[in-house]
C-alpha cells in the first residue's frame, strides 16, 4: 500500500489542523479554500460538492480533498453553520509572489453557529446568542448569553433544586445557537442538554476546557475586559457562577475572532423579578414567537405585531414579547410614547419613513469593531447616519417624557458621518483589496496616483495610435494581461510589417505579440502605481475603520435609541391599523376587558367577523371563571386572547379591545391542549399533570392562570376529581386565591360556584336549530350542561348514520335505559353494568323517585314560587 508523502504544504496543513482539531479547516490555496481528509468527506456531503483526491498522479497515498472558490465563501459558510459545524478560516497572510518557500498561512477566524458576523449567516430580526453554563457547589448555577453582533451580554445566577429547570427555561426563551459547557460536566448536564437540543433545533454543544471554569481567573478577566475595579456597577459582583459563565464566553469570542472585542461594553444582569414571567410551556401554548405546529414565525403574535422598519427595532420587539414588564411606571412610560405616535400620525409617518432608510447599525458596528467591515458596510453606515439630524428635528416636536429623553440623549454622530462622507467612495466594492474604496480629494498622495493611472489610459491610447501610424498596421492594438503585462498585438498576416525594435513575446495561432522599450518603461510606471494605489487605499480604509471602531459605544447608544423609536412608532402603527386601544394599568389585581379580541385569529378572518368578548376577573367575586360549552364554540380562544391582552399591555402596547383595565400580573401560566410530548418522553396525562403541578406550586395571588381542560388524559372520574381539587386549591391558595380562567367539559364543576363565592360560572353561547347547532362564540354568565359533542361530530364530517346512532344512544343513556338491557334503535343491548369497573363518584346518583318527579314537572307552567317549593321538596328527598 502506497505511503503518504508529506510535502511542506501538507506539513503546514497538519500543524494548523492540530491547533484547531474540532473544526473544519478551510485552507486557502490561491483562489480556492481546500479541505482534506475527514474534513473533505464531511464538507463534501454538507455542501454538495465533488469529493476528489490529492496525489492522483503520484505513487503516494491519495488524500481525500474538496474545494470551494474563495469568492463564494459566505454562501458555503452558511451551509456549514446551518449544519452545526465550526469552521476555521485559514488565509495566506503574505504575497505568494514574494514569499520565500511555502506561503505563510494563519487561521484568521473561527466561525461557529453562535459566533458569526456576516449578514448572510444571520436572521436580521433575531439575536444570535452563544451561551455558557457553569455549575458550582450546593446547586448553584451560572448562565450567560452573548450576541457578538449586537454587543448584548447577559448574566444570571440560579440556586436550588430547580436550578437546571430555570436554566432550561431561559435557554428556550432566548434560543441560543451554541451552548458552551465544561468538558468534564457534559455527563452531569446530559439531561438538560438533551432537552435543550430537542427544544431548540440546531443548538450546537461545544465542550470547553474545565480549567477555565475558575472563579478567580474569571473575575479578573471580566474586570480587565471592562476596565473596572468592581462589577458592582453592573450589579453582578455577587454572581459567582454567572461571572464564570460570562468569562467563558469572552474567552471563546477572543479565541474565535482572533481580535479584540471592544464593542462588548456592558454586562446586564437578568432581573427575573422585574419581568412578567412566562414559562416555556406557556410561551409555546400562546404561540408568542412561533406556532406550535411547524414552529413557524407566521401565525405567531410576533408576526402580527411586527411592523418595525429596522432590524434593531424588530429585535427589540421580540425581546419585549419575551420579557414583558412588571413595573407599572415603566409600562406607563412606554404607553405614553406609543400614545404620542398614535395621536400624531404625521410625526409617526415621518419617523417611520426616516427609520426605513436606516441599516442595522448594531451589526455594522460589530463588523467595524472586529475589523471585518467592507466598503459596502461603510456606505450603509454613512447612509444610516445621514438620517439622524432629520430624526432629531422631528423628536424636538415631541411632548412626551420618554421621547423627550431620547431627543436629549440621541447622538447624531455627525462627525463620523462627515468622516465617512469625505473618505469612502460613493460606490465601493465588497472586496477591500480591489481598490475604489476611497473618495478622491481625501488623500493627496492617492489623488496623484489616480491621476497617473487615469492619464496612463490616455497614454496607452496615444501610444496605440502612434504605433498604428508609424507601422501602417490599422488593427494594431495595445493590450494587457496578468501574465505578460502590456504588449502590442498584430495579426499573423501583418506581422512582417512590424519594426525591428519590436521584441517578439508570444506567438498565437492568428496573432503575434510584441513589446517595446517604451512600452516596458510605461508598464513599470503604471503597474507600480496600480499596486501602490491598492495598498494605499487599503491602508486608508483600515485607518478610517479603526477610527470608527474607537466610537463603538456611541454607535451602540444611538442604535438602542433608534430601536426604541422604531418599537414605539411601529406599535402605534399596529394600533391604528388594527383598532387597538390603550389599556389602563392598575395595581389592584383586577382585570377588566371590554370587547376583547384575539390579536392573531382576528387577522386571519375578514374584517368584522371576529366575535369579541368581555372578561372580568378580580380577587373578590370573580376570581375563578369556570367556563363550559362545546368544542369549537370558542372557549380556548377567549382564554388565550385574555392572556395575550395582558401580555401586550405589560409590554407597553395597545391592546385588541375596546377598553381594558389591567392589574399588573407577575406570572402567566397556561395549561392548554393535550398532546403527547414525545420530545420529553411524556404521555398526554403526564404533560397535563406536570404543567398543572408547576401552576399549583408557583402561582401567586398576582398571577393569571389559564386552564383549558384538565384530566382528559385519564378516566372520567379521575379527571373530574383532579379538576375539582385543582380548582379548590386555586381559590384557597395563600388565603387569597389566584385569578383563573378554567375551560372544562366537566359540567359538574359548575357546582363549585355554589360552594365558593369567588367562583363564577360562564359558558359560550350556542343556538340550536333543528338538529344542528350554531356557535355564537360569545361568553355569557351561567354554566351549561350540554357539550353538543354529537353536533360537532356532524360538523366535522362524521357519517350521518354514525351521528344518528349516537343521538339514539345519548337519548337512551339520558333516560337511564341504555344500561338497563332495553332495546335502542330496535337492537337488544347487552347488560354493561356488570362489566363496568367500579370507580367512586364525587356525586351520588339521583334516585329513580327524584328522576320521576323531575320528569313530571311542567317547567313552562311553574311560577317562581312553585319552582322554589319544588326545589326544596327535591332537596328533602336527598337527605
UniProtKB/Swiss-Prot annotation:
Q: Which terms in the Gene Ontology molecular function aspect does this entry carry? A: ATP binding; ATP-dependent DNA damage sensor activity; damaged DNA binding; mismatched DNA binding
Kindly list the positions annotated as binding ATP: 629-636
The UniProt annotation puts the region (Disordered) at: 824-845
Give a short account of what the protein does: This protein is involved in the repair of mismatches in DNA. It is possible that it carries out the mismatch recognition step. This protein has a weak ATPase activity.
Would I find Metal-binding among this entry's keywords?
no
GO biological process, any: mismatch repair
Write down any Gene Ontology CC term. cytosol
**Family as reported in the entry's similarity comment:** Belongs to the DNA mismatch repair MutS family.
Give the protein's recorded name: DNA mismatch repair protein MutS
Keywords from UniProt, A to Z, are: ATP-binding, DNA damage, DNA repair, DNA-binding, Nucleotide-binding
Q: Which PANTHER family match?
A: DNA MISMATCH REPAIR PROTEIN MSH1, MITOCHONDRIAL (PTHR11361:SF34), DNA MISMATCH REPAIR PROTEIN MUTS FAMILY MEMBER (PTHR11361)
Q: HAMAP family this protein is in?
A: MutS
Q: Which CDD domains match?
A: ABC_MutS1
Name one matching Pfam family. MutS_IV
Q: Which InterPro entries does the entry link to?
A: DNA_mismatch_repair_MutS, DNA_mismatch_repair_MutS-lik_N, DNA_mismatch_repair_MutS/MSH, DNA_mismatch_repair_MutS_C, DNA_mismatch_repair_MutS_clamp, DNA_mismatch_repair_MutS_core, DNA_mismatch_repair_MutS_N, DNA_mismatch_repair_MutS_sf
